[in-house]
Amino acid sequence: MSFVIAVPEALTMAASDLANIGSTINAANAAAALPTTGVVAAAADEVSAAVAALFGSYAQSYQAFGAQLSAFHAQFVQSLTNGARSYVVAEATSAAPLQDLLGVVNAPAQALLGRPLIGNGANGADGTGAPGGPGGLLLGNGGNGGSGAPGQPGGAGGDAGLIGNGGTGGKGGDGLVGSGAAGGVGGRGGWLLGNGGTGGAGGAAGATLVGGTGGVGGATGLIGSGGFGGAGGAAAGVGTTGGVGGSGGVGGVFGNGGFGGAGGLGAAGGVGGAASYFGTGGGGGVGGDGAPGGDGGAGPLLIGNGGVGGLGGAGAAGGNGGAGGMLLGDGGAGGQGGPAVAGVLGGMPGAGGNGGNANWFGSGGAGGQGGTGLAGTNGVNPGSIANPNTGANGTDNSGNGNQTGGNGGPGPAGGVGEAGGVGGQGGLGESLDGNDGTGGKGGAGGTAGTDGGAGGAGGAGGIGETDGSAGGVATGGEGGDGATGGVDGGVGGAGGKGGQGHNTGVGDAFGGDGGIGGDGNGALGAAGGNGGTGGAGGNGGRGGMLIGNGGAGGAGGTGGTGGGGAAGFAGGVGGAGGEGLTDGAGTAEGGTGGLGGLGGVGGTGGMGGSGGVGGNGGAAGSLIGLGGGGGAGGVGGTGGIGGIGGAGGNGGAGGAGTTTGGGATIGGGGGTGGVGGAGGTGGTGGAGGTTGGSGGAGGLIGWAGAAGGTGAGGTGGQGGLGGQGGNGGNGGTGATGGQGGDFALGGNGGAGGAGGSPGGSSGIQGNMGPPGTQGADG
């Protein structure tokens, strides 16, 4: 016969949805009734009247049919609602007699043995560490253990009866000051059928001690698997240790052992549970950071394989594989070694676990692979210390005849890691009788210090001024050039601003050109660190004593990836052109902006780490079998990515042309942006592991295993991207001409800088940097 399952809540919800749909349809019918039933005739003739009457009759028929359908819909919704109510009443009515019947069946066993025939055990109260109650003698799961109070262990899970699963152990209490408490043991599974309960997690450590051990997984009876071990308790912080993972439960006559629990920080994973007669040992638990993985559980007394070793925590070895079954079975594979992590066990990777041995008949387990080597650190460019010292200012010269201001002195050199000083300002050149007045050139920026010093900025050009009516020219001094970045890397210095050319008479005035920005350091940006060597592979297990092959050695770990190179240093910004200013009828022209500096070359990527040593192959059985092959050396690490080339400096803005008289004004041209630096060379791929493992010895009938080969070399790092070219400087603004004067002309924008060249050849070629943005016309 078929079974019908009804959910009253779902029926009630469906009835509500149907009622909403009916309301929507009724509203639509009502809205359409008046326009459709009273159709107005298109004209006064008999045909139009007949057509209108025909369509009106159609609408009236539809409304009559809609009313009948609405009544049917309401009856259907009511029936659905009543059905849901009937199911609720029926369930409530039948539940009590069934519960009473179950009570009658359980009463004799409860009175005689203190345990029901059918039913689940009660859960222990949390915070008390009380054990879970046992399940029914015939059918039922054990109850879960209650969690422990602070510092107190968790309660054990309740045992099942004939059929059922054991209860989960309670969590151990956290340590307030002392260690965390152990988790409760998982309950035993059913004698006939059922799995063991999972062990409870250990409690967290107190301020200075260790976390609690995870509870052992529950065992089981005839058919079923052992329970999982509980996780170790958490560490309290830096300097404390977590708890060891709980061991897995023993499997039934036909069943597997349970997996070991994961270890807390710095604590080992739990050992896998053993199989009994037929089955596979449980896998070892994962080790916490800095601690090994748990060993795999042993195989059964008759037929079955050993469990696999657990993964090692960061920097620690993988667990060893469990031994194969006593009569027939393979050893379990060793766990993989943990990867290298900076600050954990000296940054070294863990070795792979050894494969488990076979007993009489069977092959040894394979060794685990070594952990991955430590990744290299990315290159970091040094910073620059500000330099408060400046070059001497040029001498001011004022008098009749042509006058030129003195040049500014160069900026002082920077110390180690210090920027060069700013160049001195050019002196005033002033002609009082209308002859030429020329400002002095700004001083060059000071030499950058080694180890990251920035180039010094160039000094500003001096003011050139003429005050008479003899038609002399006023020319501002050129800005000083910025200095190149330091030998070991540094940003180029900015070019100095051109000086103002000011003519108060009838002659022309020209602003000084801006200084050239210094180049970003031509030396490479900081190189990335080399990757670490991969961990050693584990040894293969021994084959069965009579017949069986040795296990293969584990492969060496992969070398760490090289660190990325640092970006090249940016070129200095070109100096702005000086202002041309006239008060009379002469032309005022702004100075040209300075050229942006070249970007520096990106740093080389770090070399990939070497692959680890392969593990040795296991020996074959004494009578018949092949020796295990040695593990291959690990694959070399990937080279680091080359650094991005430094950006070219932006060109300086052109100077403004300004007049308060009637002369023409011309804005200065913007400076050309600097060329972007070349991308850094990609790092060399790491060498493959050169030492493969030795092959295992062969049996009396058989031969030795082959030695492991050399690992493949790592992939070369990708070349860095070329640096972006600097933006061209904006053209200077031409001022509005005075009344009756000449036109005003804006300066041209500077050209954008070229993109940097691609990365070096040892890595994958870098992409070409994008060109600089064209400066806007004034």
UniProtKB/Swiss-Prot annotation:
Residues 402-429, 436-510, 718-763 have a biased composition (Gly residues). Gene3D superfamilies: HP0062-like domain. Residues 1-92 form the PE domain. Residues 125-163, 372-510, 718-778 are annotated as: Disordered. It comes from the Bacteria. SUPFAM superfamilies: PE/PPE dimer-like. Transmembrane segments: none annotated. InterPro entries: PE-PGRS_N, PGRS_rpt. Pfam families: PE, PGRS. Belongs to the mycobacterial PE family. PGRS subfamily. This is Uncharacterized PE-PGRS family protein PE_PGRS46. It comes from Mycobacterium bovis (strain ATCC BAA-935 / AF2122/97). The gene is PE_PGRS46.
